Amino acid sequence: NVDETTFAPYVVHPMTKLSFDAQIPKKGDQRQMEAWQRIGTYAAGLALDSAGLKGNKEILGRMDMIVAAGGGERDLAVDESIMSADAKGNSSPGFLNERLMNDLRPTLFLAQLSNLLAGNIAIVHGVCGTSRTFMGEEAASIDAARIALARIESGQSEIALVGAAHNGERSDLLVLYEFGDFNLKESYAPVWQREGSSGFALGSAGCFLVLESREHAEARGAKPYARLTRVVADLAQRKQPGAVTRSLEAMWPKLGVTADSGSLITGATGAEPVT
């Protein structure tokens, strides 16, 4: 699923066409969400459906929620009008604050707070236990899963909804990454074939899981899909020779996973050559 034309020369992986009504039935709820929030709330609903928990007020009322989210989306029309007025010398003192207060919806004026995703999930799906939001991307998502697992293993939580959402179809985001020359350009190619044209293709996606203790799952007769045993992460100074290799060698023993005993999910960016 690749789009090479809408944001040319940048390559993106677009979100498939969804019927948000299936998981967010109220149009009013949908209208006050930006795309990344609709994606996340939709994915959270799918996870609850799959776990057999949709509408179970008793469990949803105590279900914990840990979400990873970015800093929200910008209103490009407002940005463009402000910059155009400034370039023409039409920006008087207080102009910027006045335009922001008058032109942006309340949620955008609040800088699209990251925890709005968790708030919308709570409103739409009734998940009312403790809530944590980590602002960021790969590292935030890994920490969300890591902390949910740790809380369940320690007995601090029995069941948790964990996940993240991202909208990669944003001109403002592509511009930010282009400042660092991080975008994949012109045409898509698998990471193993990107030598000489490094970069990653931004994508739109939502992913949510219901994690729960074995005892809790068995008590409600739930059939598990998999067992999560370890979540590990590290930060490597990539400019230092051998840093990535040392980081991977340090993390691998902590997983305790072999080719015959489990599956491995990685948060590698897809950029060559580090992936």
What are these regions (language model features)?
Residues 40-53, 114-127, 131-166, 201-222, ...:
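Active-site-proximal alpha-helical scaffold in enzymes
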Residues 1-4, 184-266:
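Condensing-enzyme catalytic core mediating Claisen C-C bond formation in acyl metabolism
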Residues 32, 105, 109, 132, ...:
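Conserved short-loop catalytic and cofactor-binding motifs
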Residues 2-125, 129, 166-168, 173, ...:
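Conserved beta-ketoacyl condensing-enzyme motif
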Residues 86-104, 146, 150, 165-220:
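Glycine-/small-residue-rich "gating" segment that lines the acyl/pantetheine channel
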Residues 8, 12-13, 167-191, 234-247, ...:
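Active-site-adjacent elements of ketosynthase-type condensing enzymes
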